[in-house]
Curated annotation (Swiss-Prot):
Protein name according to UniProt: Protein orai-2
Keyword Transmembrane helix in annotation: yes
PANTHER family to which the protein is assigned, alphabetical: CALCIUM RELEASE-ACTIVATED CALCIUM CHANNEL PROTEIN 1, PROTEIN ORAI-2
Organism listed in the record: Gallus gallus (Chicken)
Keywords, alphabetical: Membrane, Transmembrane, Transmembrane helix
Cellular component annotations (GO), alphabetically ordered: membrane
Length: 257
């Protein structure tokens, strides 16, 4: 009868069980084993979480460096290779906007590239070591704000500036087209409404909804990602709370007995 109820006859007598979870295990040993399994699983889960953060930081740094190098190089080539029509009088604000946008675009991407270049080798050195305890040597936890800053500059602000750069480049490239009438003695500049102006306007009309879609998608993506992380953490907290309530109830039952 005592073995069926799993109540030990003598507390000093060890539990006679060859496998965990058998009927011979007394209640106190079961609680102790559950606690040890919980501590061990929490230790491994913390290490797994740290390694997951390490790999995520490494992936973000790699993506930031590649994107920033590509877009900043394109902006520099666009600035150098653009050919201005000397006979056409460009709007002053258009030239100022193009120069400012190109400069800010290159500066933002080079800053993101600088952060990625400085942090990525240290993260790569730790991630290539096949040792679970080497995670503490990685600087990704301390440098997390800088990694997120480089990621945001490269993928959000940098791409928005790149879209604006494309629009301004279309205006500078197409605006002089079919806008100058040359006679033998005079040069007359057409008003707005010619073919080049219409081409630049079409590019702007197309790019504006593209930029809005990009902003909406970015906001939706980050909200979905935050919601996923929140739900996962809530499930883990609920599981820990249920286990705590179960252990507390068993402890109270043991005290009553």
């Amino acid at each position: 009868m005592s073995s069926e109820l799993n109540v030990p006859v003598d507390p000093s007598t060890p539990a006679c069980c060859s496998e965990p979870g058998t009927k011979g295990m007394d209640y106190r040993d079961w609680v102790r084993r559950s606690y040890l399994e919980l501590v061990t699983s929490n230790h491994h889960s913390v290490q797994a979480l740290s390694w997951r953060k390490l790999y995520l930081s490494r992936a973000k740094l790699k993506a930031s460096s590649r994107t920033s190098a590509l877009l900043s190089g394109f902006a520099m080539v666009a600035m150098v290779e653009v050919q201005l029509e000397m006979q056409y009088k460009y709007p002053q604000m258009l030239l100022i906007a193009f120069s400012a946008c190109t400069t800010v675009l290159v500066a933002v991407h080079l800053f993101a590239l600088l952060i990625s270049t400085c942090i990525l080798p240290n993260v790569e050195a730790v991630s290539n070591i096949h040792n679970l305890n080497s995670i503490s040597e990685s600087p990704h936890e301390r440098m997390h704000p800088y990694i997120e800053l480089a990621w945001g500059f490269s993928t959000v602000l940098g791409i928005l500036l790149f879209l604006a750069e494309v629009v301004l480049l279309c205006w500078i490239k197409f605006l002089p087209v079919d806008s100058i009438l040359k006679n033998d003695t005079t040069t007359i500049q057409k008003p707005s409404g010619h073919a080049g102006w219409q081409a630049a306007l079409v590019s702007t009309i197309i790019m504006v909804p593209v930029g809005l879609i990009f902003v909406v998608f970015t906001i939706h993506f980050y909200r979905s990602l935050v919601r996923h992380k929140t739900e996962r953490h809530n499930r883990e907290i609920e599981e820990l709370h249920k286990l705590k309530v179960q252990l507390d109830g068993h402890d109270r039952g043991m005290q009553v007995v």
